[in-house]
Structure formats: structure tokens, C-alpha cells
Amino acid sequence: MKTFSAKASEASRKWWVIDARDQVLGKVAVKAANLLRGKEKTVFTPHVDTGDFVIVINANKVRLTGKKEEQKTFMSFSGYVGGHKSENVRARRVRHPELLVERAVRGMIPHNRLGRRVYRKLKVYSGDSHPHAAQQPEVVKLTGK
């Protein structure tokens, strides 16, 4: 019996919607990363993009555990003297709420060419509407609160 290896051209792609309202950020990110990579399919092959498209809505209402809202900081550096900037999750949520989910999912997929291709299939929106109704996405139910 030969080992099966999927081909990216033969992969069937579905569209999924994850509602992040009152869901823990890590649980949303794990589910999105697994769907993006195709880990929940029987034809999963680690070096081939067999994953689906994922839409995450209500990214501004995602929940964080503990005191991360005030204590977790995002650092950036412009390259200039005195160019260090930092902001906590609360400030980041006001400016760019979708970046919280995008960064969490990005950390859970491979950091290589395949990971970049997979990451492009993630669509994150801060509101409860999205422009992908024509793709007829299916709703993903997350367990727990």
C-alpha cells in the first residue's frame, strides 16, 4: 500500500465563519489555525496547502483570560533612537481589534512559505458582517463559553 500524499490542486476548499463574540482568543485562534491548515481533513498532508478559508467576525468582542487586557503589551521599534513604542491590549483593541486575532492565528501556523500562503486565507472583521456571503460559508460552533 502506498502512502497517500494530497495535491493542492485537488483539495476541496470550504469557507467557514467563526463568531468570536465572548469566546476566548486562544480557542478561536486554535480552531481557525486548524481549519486553515486542513488538520481536520482526512487528506491532511503537512507540506501541502489543503486547508479551507476562515472568516472570523466580532473580533472586537473576543475575550481574554486573566489580566491580559491591562498587562499584556505589544512592542514595536521604528529603528530610530527613541523609537520604541508599546501599547497594551486595551489600546490595541480600540485601534485595530482584528490584529489581536490575526496575530494569535499567525503564531499557530508555520513560519515559512506554506504558512504565508495559508495565512492569506484568513479574513478577520471587527463587526458582525462580512463581504463573503457569496461563498456560502458554514458556521463553526465553538464549545464552551
Q: For the regions a protein language model found, what residue spans apply to each?
A:
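Ribosome large-subunit tunnel/peptidyl-transferase-proximal elements
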Residues: 1-103, 113, 126, 131-145
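Hydrophobic, well-ordered secondary-structure segments
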Residues: 101-102, 106, 119
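Short conserved catalytic/interaction loops centered on acidic-Pro-aromatic/His motifs
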Residues: 112-118
